[in-house]
């Protein structure tokens, strides 16, 4: 494959430019996968789409090979990694050896934040430290007296996620809310995604029985969102936000919402459909998300950025241009750049985003 990269670089002149996109499968990241499919339809013949394996922790070499396969096409000028699972930094190094001109956008990095910023040209992520405040604040406003945070050791080894957890705990204490941390099975482990989902279906009723209906649930994993939404609605508890906030993340599958072909990407339609289902299920005022599909917006903006770069409309890292594209796809959002208060480390190419919340059936 490395040899193929070397042989094909020289033949790039005058070809149609392309952008590579790596996403999870429909099991691990349905929203990102569908966003990539939408880009394929929008830019026929100009998008190379690959997926990383569901058990990406054990199959990092597969992830690396998938990224290398996109870079082997000399017409690919930029690659968006949605999400930047382990193996991403090593893959970028390998590609840059042969294609130093390749532009990488790392979306939702799983590896060390500073390492991610050093390897990729641009990094995009929700502002997890700030969300540590806003999610608990929203849950409290929705009537939560207890906050249940569901995760597993691998996710808690990620600096931004562990920092957010600590902030959430402090915010709960500040508001007089009980803080509960629940260790769930890792979906990349032996039990797989099915085992993690089954745990959610069994554990949520136990927690509600113990702490009461005014309990807010938050999980750090994409694959857990559908069973979590379903269980919270059934038990009458509170669901303030997904790990990757978006009206498309978890809600349609959990609530049985069919999206007609003509309504794909129609955010107003999906917000109304969710509201109708939540209200009918007795969850009015107790379910929320962001008004924008953030990981889809990250994907759309990154693909457009890649084409703008390849077509000479911009050069290199242009944070303001990325902000403009994100505003186009995500609406009103707050932006900041990575700043680790504890270590003093900063990364100007690491853009953090917070969107606006909507409470379904709420006042």
Question: Model-derived features: where do they sit?
Answer:
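Flexible loop/hinge segments that line or gate small-molecule binding clefts
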Residues: 95-128
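Short, well-structured alpha-helical segments in soluble
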Residues: 60-77, 94, 194-213
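Extracellular/periplasmic periplasmic-binding protein-like sensory domains
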Residues: 168-179, 226-311
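Periplasmic-binding protein-like
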Residues: 20-23, 74-85, 102-107, 148-150, ...
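Hydrophobic alpha-helical segments within soluble ligand-binding/sensing domains
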Residues: 123-148, 199-202, 270-279, 293-310
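Extracytoplasmic "Venus flytrap"
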Residues: 18-39, 43, 48-65, 80-86
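Hinge/cleft segment of the Venus flytrap/periplasmic-binding protein
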Residues: 270-363
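An alpha-beta-alpha
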Residues: 36, 128-181, 306, 321-327
């Amino acid at each position: 494959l490395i040899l193929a990269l070397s042989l094909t670089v020289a033949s790039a002149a005058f070809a149609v430019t392309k952008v590579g996109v790596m996403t999870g499968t429909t099991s691990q990241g349905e929203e990102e996968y569908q966003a990539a499919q939408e880009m394929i339809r929008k830019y026929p013949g100009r998008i190379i789409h690959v997926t990383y394996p569901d058990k990406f922790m054990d199959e990092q070499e597969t992830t690396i090979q998938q990224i290398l396969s996109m870079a082997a096409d000399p017409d690919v000028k930029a690659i968006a990694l949605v999400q930047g699972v382990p193996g991403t930094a090593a893959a970028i190094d390998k590609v840059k050896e042969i294609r130093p001109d390749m532009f990488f956008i790392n979306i939702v990095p799983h590896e060390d934040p500073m390492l991610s910023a050093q390897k990729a040209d641009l990094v995009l992520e929700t502002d997890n430290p700030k969300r540590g405040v806003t999610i608990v604040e929203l849950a409290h406003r929705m009537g939560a007296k207890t906050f249940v945070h569901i995760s597993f050791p691998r996710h808690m080894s990620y600096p931004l996620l562990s920092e957010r957890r600590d902030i959430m705990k402090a915010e709960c204490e500040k508001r007089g809310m009980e803080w509960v941390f629940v260790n769930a099975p890792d979906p990349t482990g032996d039990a797989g995604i099915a085992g993690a989902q089954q745990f959610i279906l069994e554990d949520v009723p136990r927690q509600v029985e113990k702490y009461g209906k005014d309990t807010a649930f938050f999980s750090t994993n994409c694959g857990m969102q559908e069973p979590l939404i379903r269980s919270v609605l059934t038990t009458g508890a509170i669901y303030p936000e997904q790990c990757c906030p978006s009206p498309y993340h978890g809600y349609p599958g959990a609530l049985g919402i069919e999206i007609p072909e003509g309504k794909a990407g129609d955010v107003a339609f999906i917000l109304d459909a969710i509201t109708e289902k939540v209200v009918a299920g007795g969850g009015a005022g107790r379910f929320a998300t962001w008004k924008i599909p953030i990981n889809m917006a990250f994907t759309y903006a990154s693909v457009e950025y890649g084409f703008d770069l390849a077509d000479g409309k911009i050069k290199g890292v242009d944070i303001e241009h990325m902000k403009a594209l994100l505003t186009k796809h995500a609406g009103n959002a707050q932006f900041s750049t990575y700043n680790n208060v504890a270590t003093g480390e900063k990364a100007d190419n690491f853009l953090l985003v917070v969107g606006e919340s909507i409470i379904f059936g709420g006042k």
